[in-house]
Amino acid sequence: MSIVNSIRAQIPPVHPEGYPFIGGFALVTLLFFWLWSPLGWIALVLTIWCALFFRNPVRVTPVRDDLVVSPADGRISMVTPVVPPAELGLGDKPLLRISIFMSVFNCHVNRAPVGGRIEKIVYTPGKFINAELDKASEDNERNAMVISTPSGQIGVVQIAGLIARRIVSFVRVGQTLATGERFGLIRFGSRLDVFLPEGSKALVSVGQTAIAGETVLADFRQGDGGRTYRAD
Protein backbone atom coordinates (compact mmCIF):
# COMPACT_ATOMS: atom_id res chain seq x y z
CA MET A 1 0.00 0.00 0.00
CA SER A 2 1.39 3.42 -0.96
CA ILE A 3 1.92 6.21 1.56
CA VAL A 4 -0.90 8.20 -0.06
CA ASN A 5 -3.33 5.29 0.31
CA SER A 6 -2.20 4.74 3.90
CA ILE A 7 -2.92 8.38 4.75
CA ARG A 8 -6.23 8.29 2.90
CA ALA A 9 -7.30 5.20 4.85
CA GLN A 10 -6.85 7.12 8.10
CA ILE A 11 -9.06 10.04 7.01
CA PRO A 12 -12.77 9.34 7.59
CA PRO A 13 -15.26 10.31 4.88
CA VAL A 14 -17.44 13.39 5.28
CA HIS A 15 -21.21 13.12 5.55
CA PRO A 16 -23.05 14.81 2.62
CA GLU A 17 -24.89 17.06 5.11
CA GLY A 18 -21.59 18.81 5.66
CA TYR A 19 -20.81 19.64 2.03
CA PRO A 20 -22.57 23.06 1.97
CA PHE A 21 -20.90 24.14 5.22
CA ILE A 22 -17.43 22.98 4.19
CA GLY A 23 -17.86 24.63 0.80
CA GLY A 24 -18.89 27.89 2.45
CA PHE A 25 -15.91 27.81 4.81
CA ALA A 26 -13.59 27.06 1.88
CA LEU A 27 -14.87 30.04 -0.13
CA VAL A 28 -14.42 32.35 2.86
CA THR A 29 -10.91 30.95 3.31
CA LEU A 30 -9.98 31.80 -0.28
CA LEU A 31 -11.42 35.30 0.13
CA PHE A 32 -9.49 35.89 3.35
CA PHE A 33 -6.24 34.68 1.78
CA TRP A 34 -6.81 37.19 -1.00
CA LEU A 35 -7.52 40.01 1.47
CA TRP A 36 -4.94 39.23 4.17
CA SER A 37 -3.11 35.93 4.54
CA PRO A 38 -3.20 35.71 8.39
CA LEU A 39 -7.00 35.74 8.19
CA GLY A 40 -6.78 33.06 5.53
CA TRP A 41 -4.83 30.73 7.82
CA ILE A 42 -7.38 31.20 10.59
CA ALA A 43 -10.19 30.46 8.15
CA LEU A 44 -8.33 27.37 6.90
CA VAL A 45 -8.17 25.99 10.44
CA LEU A 46 -11.92 26.58 10.80
CA THR A 47 -12.55 24.85 7.46
CA ILE A 48 -10.60 21.79 8.61
CA TRP A 49 -12.55 21.81 11.89
CA CYS A 50 -15.83 21.93 9.95
CA ALA A 51 -14.78 18.94 7.86
CA LEU A 52 -13.86 17.02 11.02
CA PHE A 53 -17.18 17.91 12.59
CA PHE A 54 -19.07 16.26 9.73
CA ARG A 55 -16.81 13.20 9.61
CA ASN A 56 -18.66 9.95 9.03
CA PRO A 57 -16.33 7.13 10.15
CA VAL A 58 -16.90 3.41 9.85
CA ARG A 59 -17.78 1.83 13.19
CA VAL A 60 -17.63 -1.83 14.27
CA THR A 61 -20.96 -2.49 15.97
CA PRO A 62 -21.59 -5.44 18.32
CA VAL A 63 -24.63 -7.23 16.92
CA ARG A 64 -26.88 -9.29 19.18
CA ASP A 65 -30.46 -9.03 20.37
CA ASP A 66 -30.78 -7.23 23.71
CA LEU A 67 -27.67 -5.08 23.29
CA VAL A 68 -28.06 -1.29 23.43
CA VAL A 69 -25.19 0.72 21.95
CA SER A 70 -24.48 4.41 22.18
CA PRO A 71 -26.29 6.51 19.54
CA ALA A 72 -23.68 9.27 19.72
CA ASP A 73 -20.04 10.08 20.26
CA GLY A 74 -19.48 12.09 23.42
CA ARG A 75 -19.49 11.96 27.19
CA ILE A 76 -22.02 10.18 29.38
CA SER A 77 -23.53 13.15 31.23
CA MET A 78 -26.47 11.55 33.06
CA VAL A 79 -27.56 8.04 34.07
CA THR A 80 -30.77 8.35 36.05
CA PRO A 81 -34.42 7.22 36.14
CA VAL A 82 -36.79 9.94 34.93
CA VAL A 83 -40.29 10.13 33.48
CA PRO A 84 -39.86 10.07 29.68
CA PRO A 85 -41.14 12.95 27.53
CA ALA A 86 -44.88 12.70 26.89
CA GLU A 87 -44.39 12.66 23.12
CA LEU A 88 -42.64 9.28 23.34
CA GLY A 89 -45.80 7.66 24.70
CA LEU A 90 -43.81 5.40 27.03
CA GLY A 91 -45.99 6.03 30.09
CA ASP A 92 -45.63 8.18 33.19
CA LYS A 93 -43.37 5.90 35.24
CA PRO A 94 -39.65 6.68 35.55
CA LEU A 95 -37.45 4.85 33.05
CA LEU A 96 -33.67 4.66 33.00
CA ARG A 97 -32.31 7.53 30.92
CA ILE A 98 -28.75 7.59 29.62
CA SER A 99 -27.68 10.97 28.24
CA ILE A 100 -24.70 11.53 25.94
CA PHE A 101 -23.42 15.09 25.53
CA MET A 102 -21.71 15.89 22.23
CA SER A 103 -19.25 18.77 22.14
CA VAL A 104 -18.40 20.65 18.95
CA PHE A 105 -15.34 18.40 18.60
CA ASN A 106 -17.28 15.12 18.51
CA CYS A 107 -18.55 13.33 15.43
CA HIS A 108 -22.24 14.25 15.22
CA VAL A 109 -23.63 11.44 13.07
CA ASN A 110 -26.19 9.57 15.20
CA ARG A 111 -26.68 5.79 15.11
CA ALA A 112 -29.52 3.51 16.17
CA PRO A 113 -28.93 2.17 19.70
CA VAL A 114 -30.89 -1.01 18.89
CA GLY A 115 -32.24 -2.85 15.90
CA GLY A 116 -35.99 -2.66 15.43
CA ARG A 117 -38.97 -0.96 13.83
CA ILE A 118 -39.52 2.78 14.17
CA GLU A 119 -42.96 3.18 15.74
CA LYS A 120 -43.00 6.94 16.18
CA ILE A 121 -41.09 10.11 15.30
CA VAL A 122 -42.15 13.39 16.91
CA TYR A 123 -40.47 16.77 16.34
CA THR A 124 -40.97 19.38 19.08
CA PRO A 125 -39.85 23.01 18.58
CA GLY A 126 -38.32 24.72 21.58
CA LYS A 127 -35.51 26.76 23.08
CA PHE A 128 -31.74 26.42 22.68
CA ILE A 129 -30.41 26.40 26.25
CA ASN A 130 -27.30 24.49 27.31
CA ALA A 131 -27.94 20.84 26.37
CA GLU A 132 -26.10 19.64 29.48
CA LEU A 133 -28.83 21.05 31.73
CA ASP A 134 -31.47 18.57 32.83
CA LYS A 135 -34.33 20.88 31.80
CA ALA A 136 -33.05 20.90 28.22
CA SER A 137 -34.91 17.62 27.69
CA GLU A 138 -38.19 19.49 28.25
CA ASP A 139 -37.45 23.02 27.01
CA ASN A 140 -35.18 22.59 23.98
CA GLU A 141 -35.95 21.78 20.37
CA ARG A 142 -35.87 18.01 20.02
CA ASN A 143 -36.72 15.06 17.81
CA ALA A 144 -38.04 11.97 19.60
CA MET A 145 -38.14 8.45 18.18
CA VAL A 146 -39.50 5.17 19.53
CA ILE A 147 -37.97 1.89 18.34
CA SER A 148 -39.81 -1.38 18.97
CA THR A 149 -37.65 -4.41 19.82
CA PRO A 150 -38.33 -7.93 21.19
CA SER A 151 -37.13 -6.65 24.58
CA GLY A 152 -39.47 -3.67 24.62
CA GLN A 153 -39.64 -0.13 23.30
CA ILE A 154 -36.59 2.14 23.34
CA GLY A 155 -36.91 5.92 23.28
CA VAL A 156 -34.26 8.02 21.54
CA VAL A 157 -34.33 11.82 21.74
CA GLN A 158 -32.08 14.18 19.78
CA ILE A 159 -31.85 17.47 21.70
CA ALA A 160 -30.55 20.74 20.24
CA GLY A 161 -28.21 22.88 22.32
CA LEU A 162 -26.71 26.36 22.57
CA ILE A 163 -24.87 26.10 19.26
CA ALA A 164 -26.78 23.25 17.64
CA ARG A 165 -29.74 24.73 15.82
CA ARG A 166 -30.60 22.03 13.33
CA ILE A 167 -31.67 18.45 13.98
CA VAL A 168 -31.54 16.23 10.90
CA SER A 169 -33.34 12.88 10.61
CA PHE A 170 -32.72 10.37 7.80
CA VAL A 171 -35.48 7.91 8.72
CA ARG A 172 -39.27 7.53 8.71
CA VAL A 173 -41.97 5.78 10.72
CA GLY A 174 -42.29 2.09 9.81
CA GLN A 175 -38.67 1.76 8.77
CA THR A 176 -36.60 -1.06 10.26
CA LEU A 177 -33.19 -0.11 11.60
CA ALA A 178 -30.17 -2.27 12.27
CA THR A 179 -28.18 -1.69 15.44
CA GLY A 180 -25.63 1.03 14.74
CA GLU A 181 -27.31 2.21 11.54
CA ARG A 182 -27.10 5.95 10.90
CA PHE A 183 -30.42 7.70 11.53
CA GLY A 184 -29.60 11.39 11.80
CA LEU A 185 -27.29 14.10 13.06
CA ILE A 186 -27.35 17.34 15.02
CA ARG A 187 -25.24 20.24 13.83
CA PHE A 188 -22.65 21.79 16.13
CA GLY A 189 -23.01 20.40 19.65
CA SER A 190 -25.98 18.77 21.34
CA ARG A 191 -27.26 15.80 23.37
CA LEU A 192 -28.82 12.37 22.86
CA ASP A 193 -31.10 10.73 25.44
CA VAL A 194 -31.84 7.00 25.44
CA PHE A 195 -34.80 5.71 27.48
CA LEU A 196 -34.61 2.02 28.35
CA PRO A 197 -37.42 -0.39 29.35
CA GLU A 198 -38.31 -0.83 33.00
CA GLY A 199 -35.80 -2.96 34.89
CA SER A 200 -32.85 -2.09 32.66
CA LYS A 201 -29.39 -1.64 34.14
CA ALA A 202 -26.75 0.65 32.69
CA LEU A 203 -23.28 -0.64 31.81
CA VAL A 204 -21.80 2.87 31.63
CA SER A 205 -21.10 5.60 34.18
CA VAL A 206 -21.24 9.39 34.20
CA GLY A 207 -18.06 10.86 32.74
CA GLN A 208 -17.31 7.86 30.53
CA THR A 209 -16.52 8.46 26.87
CA ALA A 210 -18.99 6.87 24.45
CA ILE A 211 -18.45 5.93 20.82
CA ALA A 212 -21.51 5.82 18.58
CA GLY A 213 -22.36 2.34 17.38
CA GLU A 214 -19.68 0.68 19.52
CA THR A 215 -20.00 1.47 23.24
CA VAL A 216 -22.53 -0.85 24.90
CA LEU A 217 -24.89 1.14 27.14
CA ALA A 218 -26.97 -1.80 28.39
CA ASP A 219 -27.38 -5.54 27.91
CA PHE A 220 -30.78 -7.10 28.59
CA ARG A 221 -29.35 -10.62 28.50
CA GLN A 222 -27.15 -12.19 31.19
CA GLY A 223 -23.70 -13.13 29.97
CA ASP A 224 -22.05 -12.21 26.72
CA GLY A 225 -22.61 -15.20 24.46
CA GLY A 226 -23.52 -15.02 20.83
CA ARG A 227 -22.22 -11.51 20.17
CA THR A 228 -20.95 -10.77 16.65
CA TYR A 229 -19.73 -7.56 15.05
CA ARG A 230 -20.53 -5.59 11.89
CA ALA A 231 -18.52 -2.77 10.32
CA ASP A 232 -20.50 0.15 8.90
Curated annotation (Swiss-Prot):
Catalytic center residues: S190 (schiff-base intermediate with substrate)
UniProt lineage: Bacteria, Pseudomonadati, Pseudomonadota, Alphaproteobacteria, Hyphomicrobiales
Organism: Rhodopseudomonas palustris (strain BisA53)
Record keywords: Cell membrane, Decarboxylase, Lipid biosynthesis, Lipid metabolism, Lyase, Membrane, Phospholipid biosynthesis, Phospholipid metabolism, Pyruvate, Zymogen
GO cellular component, one term: plasma membrane
Protein family: Belongs to the phosphatidylserine decarboxylase family. PSD-A subfamily.
Role, per record: Catalyzes the formation of phosphatidylethanolamine (PtdEtn) from phosphatidylserine (PtdSer).
Bilayer topology term: Peripheral membrane protein
Quaternary structure and interacting proteins, as annotated: Heterodimer of a large membrane-associated beta subunit and a small pyruvoyl-containing alpha subunit.
Record localization: Cell membrane
Residues of the site described as Cleavage (non-hydrolytic): G189, S190
Catalytic activity: a 1,2-diacyl-sn-glycero-3-phospho-L-serine + H(+) = a 1,2-diacyl-sn-glycero-3-phosphoethanolamine + CO2
Chief location category: membrane
Protein's UniProt name: Phosphatidylserine decarboxylase proenzyme
Pathway annotation from the record: Phospholipid metabolism; phosphatidylethanolamine biosynthesis; phosphatidylethanolamine from CDP-diacylglycerol: step 2/2
Cofactor note: Binds 1 pyruvoyl group covalently per subunit.
